[in-house]
Amino acid sequence: MMENNRNYFIAIALSVLIVLGWQFLYMNPRIEAQRKAQEAQKAQQQTEQVQQPAAGGATPAPASGTAPSGQAVATATLEQALAKTPRVAIDTPALSGSINLAGARLDDLKLKGYHETVDDSSPIITLFSPAETKDGYFTELGYIGSDATGSVPGASTLWTAPEGAKLTEKTPVTLSYTNDKGLTFTRTISVDERYMFTIADKVANTGQAPVSLSSYGRVTRYNKPTTPSAYVLHEGFIGVIGDDGLIESKYTAVEKEAVMPAKSTGGWLGITDKYWAATIVPPQASAYEARFSHFSDGQPRYQADYKDDAFTVAPGQSVELKNLVFAGAKEVPVIDGYEASYSIPRFDRLIDWGWFYFITKPMFKLMDFFFRFFGNFGVAILCTTIVVKALFFPLASKQYASMANMKRMQPKMEELKAKFGDDRMGLQQATMQLYKEEKINPIAGCWPVALQIPIFFSLYKVIYITIEMRHAPFFGWIQDLSAPDPTTIVNLFGLLPFTAPTFLHLGVWPLIMGVTMFLQMRMNPTPPDPTQAMIFNWMPLVFMFMLASFPAGLVIYWAWNNTLSVIQQSVIMKRHGVKIELFDNLKGLFRRKTAPSK
C-alpha cells in the first residue's frame, strides 16, 4: 500500500511513543511510589529540625549574605505556629490567611477557589505556611544595615499594626517599626482581588546623621513539594533577570550549586509549582543581585532571594521602595493581566508553555474562547480540534491527493519491481524517473505529519499544565480533564470488588480512542510487508493501554481527532476518486480463511 500513508502512522507512532513510554514506564510508578510515601508520612508522627529565624533582624541569607545557623526547634503544627506571634488577618475573594507581624512575613495563605480534590468539601489549597511547620513556605522583605543604622527590619523584627486591622482587597494595612537610631520604617501592604500584593515601604531618617542600608526580598521553601515533578514542565526556581533573561533551575540542580545571575535591573524571581507560584518583583529602577540557593542546616531550605544596592537616607529625609509579591494560582488571564498592567517583563513565562510557545499559548486562547461560549472545557477541546482540522484541511487534501496519485501508480511500480528484480539501484533510479514523468512529489504527504506533531504536543501541554483544566469536568464520569479516566474495564467499571493495578487500568475513553484509531488505520489497505502489517495491527492496542494513564482531556482529543480524520479522509478520497478501503478491510479482517482445496 501507499508508502506515504505507512510513513504517516509510523512517524506519528515514533514521535508519540516517546512521551507515552516515559509517562507509562517512568511517571506512573513514580507517582504511585510517592503517593504511598506520602500516606506513610502522614500516618507517622515525626520530630524534625527546622531553622529558627535569627534574632535582632539579622540577614536571612540574601544574595550576598551568609545563612545564619539558627536554633533548632521541634516542628510545630500549623495551629501552634500561628499562635506564636501576633498577626493581621487576610480576607479577599481569592485568599485567606494572615500576615506574621514578626518579620512582616506572608507565611499563612490559602487559595479559596481551589480544593485539594474534585470534592468541594475537601480542604482548600494551602500555599504558604509558617517556617516552624514541616512544610514552611513564605515570602519576606527586609533590610540589611550596619552599626550606624541600628537594628533594621529583618526576620524576627516585630512590626506594629493598628488594632483590629484586616487586609482586604479594599482596605490596605499599614505596619510600622522605629529603632533606637531614629529610623522609622512604614510598610503599607495592599492586595487586589486575585493574587498580587503591593508592598510599599517608606524609610524616614529622624536622626542627625545620614545612614546607608540595603533592602532584600526572598521566597523561602522548606523541603520540596510532595507531588512528583514531571519533565514535561518546569517546577522549581524561576525568574526573568536582566540580560540573563528567563532562568529556570530545578531543585536538584540548585542543591548542587547555587545560581547567581549577573547584577541587573528589572525582572522578577521566585518559586513555581505546576499550578501555583510565589514570586517577588523588586523595585524595577534599582540594580540588584539575585540568587537561587539551597541550605541544609537543620531542615532543607530552598530560597530565591535578591539584595539591592545600598541607598542613603539623609537626616530629615525619607526613601520609598515598592515591591510586588505574586502568591497564588497561575491563571492565564490573571498572569497576562499582571504582565500588562505592571509592565513585568515576560511574566507570562511563569506558566511553562514549552518550546512550542508560539503554538501552545494561542491554542489555549482558542480553547478558552470556546470555554467561555460553552462553559465546558471538554466541549472546548472538541471545538478546538475541529478548528485545527479545518485549518489543516488544505494540507491534508494535498497529502491524500499525493497518496491517490501514488495508488494509481501501483501497477507501474509493480512492473518496475518485476523488471529490475534484485537490482535496487536500478529500481530506485527508474522509480524516481517515473515520479518525474508523472509529476509526483513522493514526500508531499510528509508535511502534514510534520506540522501535526507540534500541534499534538502543544495540546498535551495545554491540558497538562494549565490550571484551567484542573478539576474541569466533561460529561458523565469525567470530572477532571487533567486526570486519567477513572473507570477501568478490568473490574467491569467497578462492578467487581477489586482495584486493578496501574498498568492494567483501562478506562472507557482510552477504549474509545483505541477503536477510533483502529478504524482510522483500516481506511487504507493492509501493508504487504508482514512486519508493517503486524505493527499496524498492534498499534491501536498498545496506544490504548499507554494512553490510559494520560489526562482524560488528551484521550478525548485523540479519540475525537481520529473520528474527524476518518470523516476527512473519506471526503478527500472520494473527491479524488480513490476507493475507501475501510469496509473491505473490516470484511477481510473478520472473514474466515478457507482451507486450500486438495
UniProtKB/Swiss-Prot annotation:
InterPro entries registered for this protein in UniProt: Membr_insert_YidC (IPR019998), Membr_insert_YidC_N (IPR028053), YidC/ALB3/OXA1/COX18 (IPR001708), YidC/Oxa/ALB_C (IPR028055), YidC_ALB_C (IPR047196), YidC_periplasmic_sf (IPR038221)
Keywords: Cell inner membrane, Cell membrane, Chaperone, Membrane, Protein transport, Transmembrane, Transmembrane helix, Transport
Molecular function as annotated in GO: membrane insertase activity
Primary location group: membrane
GO biological-process terms attached to the record: protein insertion into membrane; protein transport
Membrane topology field: Multi-pass membrane protein
Subcellular location: Cell inner membrane
Chain segments annotated as transmembrane: 7-27, 373-393, 447-467, 492-512, 538-558
Comp. bias regions, Low complexity: 40-71
Region (Disordered), start-end ranges: 37-71
Protein function: Required for the insertion and/or proper folding and/or complex formation of integral membrane proteins into the membrane. Involved in integration of membrane proteins that insert both dependently and independently of the Sec translocase complex, as well as at least some lipoproteins. Aids folding of multispanning membrane proteins.
Complex formation: Interacts with the Sec translocase complex via SecD. Specifically interacts with transmembrane segments of nascent integral membrane proteins during membrane integration.
Membership in a protein family: Belongs to the OXA1/ALB3/YidC family. Type 1 subfamily.
Protein name: Membrane protein insertase YidC
Gene, per the UniProt record: yidC
